[in-house]
């Protein structure tokens, strides 16, 4: 049931986002600030921003739903973080940071030429349009349950609002609003977790199979095995943490190379525990 408190939370969030955008815009110095934020951010702020970037509304909705259907085995695809983060921190971040680039596509032009930069930039934009479309749709599905608007209107409003505050302050606004979004996400998740615990009458409805995390099957038709997570998904996560512009751009906004590496460590190892928490929500929902 939608209450006045729901609208109050949304209003406060929108107001804080606008204030952050205005404040950052007033402090903006030059064009480089738009892409790197003046390289002023600490490891915690940048790390939380990376987490908020990678863990979107799809995670909030999708991970509990996946565990609800497949059990805790869904966590297998996230067991590769120690391997992936090691390579990202040791081999990728130092190269991008030391060369002073504002994007990974500058490195592609430097290393392979302008055609490599252009092609990869276009592909990245197309992929992000598809990915962002899915995320926007997921958020809009929630928003139309609260506000008397259609799903098309919800998508348009979210897109325009996000584009405006991003354009006003660049990466600095994005990072600080990521902090705000993370706080809202954590508060909401914890509230749901507590409410479910209060409503659930014991764990009698949970089977051993649902709680089992490690799946050692060699079945290529199952996507929640340990081998799928450690071997196959490692390459996917390597591209995400090592060469994804959305992730790397935030590390390039930090004060120094060591700070950039620490921010990636926070994101990588923090992400697993967040996914684990959402997995527990899925278990609770299965017995709710």
Please report, for each region that a protein language model flagged, where it lies by residue.
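Membrane-interface "cap" regions at the ends of multi-pass membrane proteins
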Residues: 1-60, 166-169, 182, 188
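Loop-to-helix junctions at membrane interfaces in multi-pass transport proteins
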Residues: 1-3, 36-41, 45, 62-76, ...
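Lipid-exposed faces of alpha-helical membrane segments in multi-pass integral membrane proteins
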Residues: 5-19, 48, 80-87, 119-126, ...
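Juxtamembrane interface elements at the cytosolic ends of transmembrane helices
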Residues: 16-31, 91-105, 164, 168-170, ...
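Helix-loop-helix module between adjacent transmembrane segments
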Residues: 17, 52, 75-167, 232-240
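Hydrophobic alpha-helical segments and their helix-loop junctions in multi-pass secondary transporters
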Residues: 22-27, 93, 129-136, 140-157, ...
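Membrane-helix interface/capping residues of multi-pass secondary transporters
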Residues: 31, 72, 114, 151-152, ...
